[in-house]
Amino acid sequence: MDIEICIDNIESALIAQNSGADRLEVCGCLALGGVTPPYSLIKTVLDVCNIPCYVMIRPRSGDFLFNAHEIKMMEQDIHIAKQLGAQGVVIGALTENGEIDLSICHRLISAAEGLGVTFHRAFDLCSDPYHGLEQLIELGCERVLTSGQQRTAFEGRYVLKTLVQQAKGRIKIMAGAGVNPNNALELVKISKVDELHLSAKTFRQSSMKGNSSVTMGNKAEDDYKIWTTDRNQIIAIKKLFQE
């Protein structure tokens, strides 16, 4: 069972690799669901990690209805990821009706020629996931990341099971959202998904002297709480599938 860990900083990338992760999804700002990471993070992760790295291609948070400028931005980001040596990219685009935007996806996949392509959880907003799955297969996507159109992958386990049965090995189904050591084994037993995706997040407190009168952005966020990958969660999940 391959385990993909999504990360948004170099500390987490190293923890994930050293804890047994099989692949990294390199993102910016996981608190927003993940956006395109900076050039410097992509390059540094690729320089110091020796497991496959897929780069998130998402120009902003919010919906997956992109304008012409954003499409060009995504194409450029894919070219950068390719030039830096990434093994794959993570994409997704929908129409106003909640269908896979075939035109945009064709452009992005063409830009990614030679790289692996994962379609991200925009899939969980599809109006018809079963038709959408066939479209992703036709597009040539390597895998789709999905929670089975539910809040968590465990809640969507029976939809995931149906998607796996429909896919018949033509595309990998990777379950993500709320995956943890307490539900991973049961999730896989029921759904038979090919891979698991998780952030395995924890946090450490900053050692920097603070100023409680100032916040840097969202007031609900603690600027002195540093989110990182929890090695114990990864080790525990890997162990589940080795027994």
From Swiss-Prot:
Record-linked Gene3D superfamilies: Copper homeostasis (CutC) domain
Keywords attached to this entry: Cytoplasm
Domain of life: Bacteria
Molecular-function annotations in GO: copper ion binding
UniProt xrefs under InterPro entries: CutC-like, CutC-like_dom_sf
Cellular component annotations (GO), alphabetically ordered: cytoplasm
One matching Pfam family: CutC
Location of the protein in the cell: Cytoplasm
UniProt similarity note: Belongs to the CutC family.
Protein's recorded name: PF03932 family protein CutC
Organism of origin: Histophilus somni (strain 2336)
